[in-house]
Design a protein with these regions (language model features):
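N-terminal membrane topogenic signal
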Residues: 1-11
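Juxtamembrane "helix-exit" motif on the non-cytosolic side of transmembrane helices
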Residues: 20-28, 83-94
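Non-cytosolic membrane-interface motifs at loop->transmembrane helix junctions
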Residues: 28-36, 64-65, 92-104, 128-129
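Hydrophobic/aromatic-rich structural module bridging two neighboring secondary-structure elements via a short loop
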Residues: 33-37, 41, 48-85
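Hydrophobic cores of alpha-helical transmembrane segments in multi-pass inner/ER membrane proteins
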Residues: 39-52, 107-119, 182-197
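Membrane-interface transmembrane-helix boundary segments in multi-pass integral membrane proteins
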Residues: 156-195
Length: 218
């Protein structure tokens, strides 16, 4: 196992631990949070990558997977950004300073970002990738609104239940304000997506001269 594979395995394990603690302490309703779902996506995807790399070699020879990984990275990056700047200031100190909180909101997101920046091949993203990457958060937003207005599945640990987050609570702030909040977050998401795209033009692994196909040629 390479150092990159070991690092990704560690991130996946930490994500699994964080989500498991959430569910054990607060129930399966935690899966209605974007934070929890984004961590599930990360540890599932990284586990898949580790297995695939052990069989087929580095994913740096697979542009499609790298672009998909960019989307996974953005999915968890927004978890960190929204929590740290919008939600953390409202969290009580005894809820903030917990292992599960730091795992799902800080350690896993920042480690995933670091992995993408340093370990992934540079100059691989296309100009429209950030637009594609935003689809998953938008789908979650649609689901969260449907749940808050129609399904009303209870969400543990929030006074805004059945809405997961205060800034999309339509009953409290109204549709117009919620849509404005969502638009601002979406625009910031796109901005950071293009920042990631720009950074990856400059840093990361250089294109490999050989890949598995060339190594297997006789």
């Amino acid at each position: 196992m390479s150092k990159t594979q070991a690092f990704r395995s560690l991130i996946a394990l930490l994500g699994l631990i964080g989500v498991s603690i959430q569910i054990k302490q607060s129930g399966w309703g935690m899966l209605l949070y974007y934070t929890t779902l984004s961590n599930v996506i990360v540890f599932s995807f990284l586990t898949y990558l580790v297995i695939k790399e052990k069989r087929n070699g580095s994913i740096n020879s697979n542009p499609k997977l790298l672009r998909l990984k960019g989307g996974v990275t953005m999915t968890i990056m927004i978890t960190f950004m929204v929590y740290h700047f919008l939600l953390a200031p409202k969290v009580r100190s005894y809820d903030y300073y917990t292992i599960r909180n730091f795992l799902v909101h800080y350690i896993v997101p920042l480690s995933t970002i670091f992995d993408t920046l340093i370990c992934d091949r540079r100059k691989i993203y296309r100009w429209f990738d950030p637009i594609i990457w935003i689809c998953l958060p938008l789908l979650y937003f649609g689901f969260a609104i449907i749940n808050g207005l129609l399904l009303k599945w209870p969400i543990p640990g929030t006074a805004d239940s059945p809405f997961p987050y205060f800034f999309i609570n339509m009953n409290k702030y109204g549709a117009q304000q919620v849509l404005i909040n969502a638009l601002v977050i979406a625009l910031l998401y796109l901005l950071f997506g293009y920042i990631l795209l720009g950074i990856k033009q400059m840093i990361g692994q250089k294109r490999q001269v050989t890949d598995n196909s060339s190594l297997n040629m006789s």
